[in-house]
Amino acid sequence: MISLVRTIVASTSLLVAVHASATPIGGIEFPQGAISFADLVVSYMPGSDVGGTYMGPAEALGMPDYNDSVQEGAVSLGKGGSLTVAFTDNSLTTSGDSAGDLWVFEIGSAVESFQVEISTNNVNWIDLGFVLGQPTGIDIDAIAGVNVGELYSYVRLTDTPGNQSGFPYGEADIDAIGAISSGHAVPLPAPAGFALFGLGLILLAVSRRR
């Protein structure tokens, strides 16, 4: 009997903890709160119509935090540009229903479209299609090629053809990328390319200060 009571108490505590961690962010409830959002910039190839504070890819990491008064907190894709990020303390997975699993927070007065893809390994990609909205929710369960229960660590956003806005915030401006349907973290490889990309960001920052 005591064992049964302990089991019930433990189960109740777990349910309370999960419910307590659910956090409304940008008007959308993320069950896992802050850890739901992308943590790592894998690659960033901006178009020519991006400059100033809008070409910092790390601005797309973490929870949405764009500050319109100082125009900081978002990164622009630019014409033909792309951004690839990864989840390191969680992953994106299916939900088993028609609700949005992946949410992309895009900012600005213009609602600009972009292509969204996901991957388990940063090599083989599944196209989720062209989307737009502020923010945009995508039901990955409805996408051909997405496997039930698969854990996706990578998200790639690519500008769609056509000029949607100009310098310095060309095309879609990304504030955050979050997984509502969040699975456990998957260990990611650390290829040399990641290190070289990080070095490139450091050199870019140094050159701006001169």
Model-derived regions, located:
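A domain-level signal for the mature, folded cores of soluble proteins
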Residues: T23-I118, N122-A185
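Hydrophobic helical h-region of N-terminal Sec-dependent signal peptides
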Residues: A10-L14, G200
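N-terminal signal peptide c-region/cleavage motif recognized by signal peptidases
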Residues: A17-V18
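A short, hydrophobic C-terminal helix/tail in secreted or cell-surface proteins
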Residues: P189-S207
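Bacterial N-terminal signal peptides that target proteins for export
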Residues: M1-I8, P191-A192
